[in-house]
Each structure stands twice: as C-alpha cells, then as structure tokens.
C-alpha cells in the first residue's frame, strides 16, 4: 500500500511554514525514514498521513486514493501509530492497551484479548506482563507494548514518530533490531521519523534527509547516500552524527564497501549478508536495510 505526497505544503496560523511543496513516494512494504533536525517538518509530514494534521495545499494519496476524502477516525484506526514514550494509557493494563483499537473497531473482547496476547509474543514480551500497568514496566518494555498496540489491527501502514528516542542506548539497539526482525516477518509500509542519521541508515530501505520546511536534501538507499552525498549540507549532516567525521565509501571486492572517515582511517565496512545491507564495525554487525 504505497503512500504518495504531491506538492504538499503546511502553513500554521502563526505563519510558520512547516512543509513547503513536498513530494515523495513511500514504497509499499518497505521502511522509509524521514530524518532531519528540529524544525525540518518530519513529524508534521508523519501526522498528515493519518490526518492528525491537514495540509494547507497539495494531496496525500494512500493506495492511489486522496485521504482528504476519507473520514479521519476510521482512517486512523486502520493505520498503526507508535510514538515516543509509548503513549500508553496509564490506568489500563498492558492487555487492555494493546486491545484498545480492535475493541473500538468492533472486535469482540475475547478475540481482541487473544490478538493482544499473540502480539506480546510477536514483540518479544512475556504474556505474564499482560496484567501489569505501564508504570510497572521498564522503558524498553513500554515501547514494545507501544509497537504491539500499533500492530493490533494488522495495519498495512505503520507510522513511527521517534519511538526509540527516550530509552537508553542499549535498549534502543535492542528495539531497533526487533523492528528489523518484525519488518522482515510482516512487511509493513513503515514511515519512521528520527533525528539520528545512524538510526535512519540502520532501519531505512529509503532514507529522506530533510532541511527546514521539509525540503528534501537527498533521498535514496543508505549506501547511495553514504557513497555520494548530494550537497555540503548532507555531508555535514552525516559528519555531525558521526563525531564530526565525513564518511566516504571505497569499494572493495563483491558487494562490500569500506567506510573511510575524513582523516582517511577505516570507520567500518558495509556488507550485504543474505541480501541485506549491514554495517560491520569491529566485530559487531547490524542490519541496515535491503541491499
């Protein structure tokens, strides 16, 4: 189920232009990552997909249908949404949180609860946590519940707004790997927002680097962007999030490519194990999108 932005702009009442003439195709069953600094319009773009924000001009199409003609509430209920800090209802159990949207769409309680328990398995949580409340969970567990809730109605589209930004680095790495596993198994159309270029390169099949006003500085596969930054802005953006190093790619044998920093030292290797791009730095390998 592809998503298409056609010349979309968003101007707020105070005159702020959050999005200026933005066009993009989000391919079906792939992960597209919108990455940029604060004020780049990435979250506004995400929120326009499920009509939490309305474009000032332009069109957004889902499966070739203009969502401006869709009723907002039913639209939102068929699109998964995962946010930072999980957004769980504190007075409801884990089971009830995950089962909320299915129940709202008319699924009987027993079936909704069974689906919720299955999703706890899917996101790697013990079913014994089902009767706990969010405050009784760790930050990583809360985020996993948030992902389970986003998947509860088996949506074709999953929107993720900096979902791992509030957890510690170790938990974040675990959650990123879990998302890669889930996407490999489920094949959703994922739109993921982050300010972290490393996270974008790790998770994205398509990475879209944004400047102010959601102007596209560069879009493409992580390997393409690393090999050929489109501008000084892109090169700088990549360098800042890598300890102010500018990375370039030297091609090696086969599908491997050597990452070289600005001083000429090797920073890692891009490999393609099993057809998926990965970063290999020292002895650690992390998946990074379809090659």
Briefly describe each language-model feature range.
Residues 152-156:
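A short, proline-enriched helix->beta-strand linker immediately N-terminal to the Walker B motif
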Residues 158-162:
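Catalytic Walker B motif of ABC-type/P-loop ATPase nucleotide-binding domains
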Residues 110-128:
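Conserved ABC ATPase "signature" region
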Residues 50:
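Helix-to-loop junction immediately C-terminal to a conserved catalytic motif
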Residues 133-137, 141-143:
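Conserved ABC ATPase signature
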Residues 95-103, 113, 117:
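Short helical segment in ABC ATPase nucleotide-binding domains corresponding to the A-loop/adjacent helical element
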Residues 66-80, 104, 109-110:
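ABC ATPase NBD coupling module
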